[in-house]
């Protein structure tokens, strides 16, 4: 079986969804920009040699509809002979895109794939056109379709206090801002054209979503967003709404060597699981455990974790049940996470994987794990190993 390697991993800056940098930039353009960038950064690869493109996107309608993967590839002037498919596993879409490409390479059906994902939550809102079947309520709690309420449920089940949530959310912003100031995101961010508050065209090379002034004390003043009477989850402890894309160049190890490209990481194992939709945010726990089992590892073997921060109330129970509460500041989301950077749904799986690989290189770490919760009760995880 072929070994699968990551040759390159990049992303756009994360733009605010409400009146942000990319308010006049379409999702296809964000995607095409990264596709072109991967090719220009790796000139040894001819675009015609790409076997397939796998691109995650959740709200596949409006500008994100009609197979955005193919639309973006055409905009990027990738040869018409190269196919492209859009993948949807909700929040895990672009990590699923990576898994799909990896399996194609493992079986020998492909040797080179572009993978990634995008979501423009400013142009295509998360709930646009959503119409749940009424019959779902016979099997699933109605609140299972309301992500904030699933986070509230997890916080109650696991004893996650409002103070713990506020402290974790403040940490996310502080660490993301520190990483920005130190230039730690420069290797992964591809400067991308957008517009400033006055509508002037500008090149963005930083995440505008981060709020460096955030403190736990300030967050403590916010009202509950989803359960006004008894809740603890606020807008400040939830992932920010943002627009962005992320992309990776994935190959068989033998093909990368043939082209003279240096692999940056190898996929050690992959896993996806289901869980109770009412606590959808718990999915990373069984997914991570399964991925670790497949790799013959335990959580203590992993040097660095990137765990998507859908909500502070959601990620903290996952950290607790993976036995990592005492190692948060040594291993988990060291550059902040989605609370600070945002969670463009179809982008996030590739985004956290990209951030993880860059962080592993900077800290000379051998093993890393990226994992996400998924709406309606799923979890997805990938174990990466430095080459």
UniProtKB/Swiss-Prot annotation:
UniProt entry tagged with the keyword Acyltransferase: yes
Pathway: Lipid metabolism; fatty acid beta-oxidation
Pfam families, alphabetized: Thiolase_C, Thiolase_N
MF (Gene Ontology): acetyl-CoA C-acyltransferase activity
Assigned GO CC terms: cytoplasm
Active site residues according to the UniProt entry: 91, 343, 373
GO terms under biological process: fatty acid beta-oxidation; phenylacetate catabolic process
PROSITE patterns, per database record: THIOLASE_1 (PS00098), THIOLASE_2 (PS00737), THIOLASE_3 (PS00099)
Keywords for this protein: Acyltransferase, Cytoplasm, Fatty acid metabolism, Lipid degradation, Lipid metabolism, Transferase
CDD domains attached to this UniProt entry: thiolase (cd00751)
Localization terms from the record: Cytoplasm
Primary location: cytoplasm
Catalysis performed (reactions): an acyl-CoA + acetyl-CoA = a 3-oxoacyl-CoA + CoA
Broadest EC class assigned to this enzyme: transferase
EC number: 2.3.1.16
Record's subunit section: Heterotetramer of two alpha chains (FadB) and two beta chains (FadA).
Similarity comment: Belongs to the thiolase-like superfamily. Thiolase family.
HAMAP family per record: FadA
Job description of the protein: Catalyzes the final step of fatty acid oxidation in which acetyl-CoA is released and the CoA ester of a fatty acid two carbons shorter is formed.
Protein name, as recorded: 3-ketoacyl-CoA thiolase
Protein source organism: Cronobacter sakazakii (strain ATCC BAA-894) (Enterobacter sakazakii)
Gene from which this protein is expressed: fadA
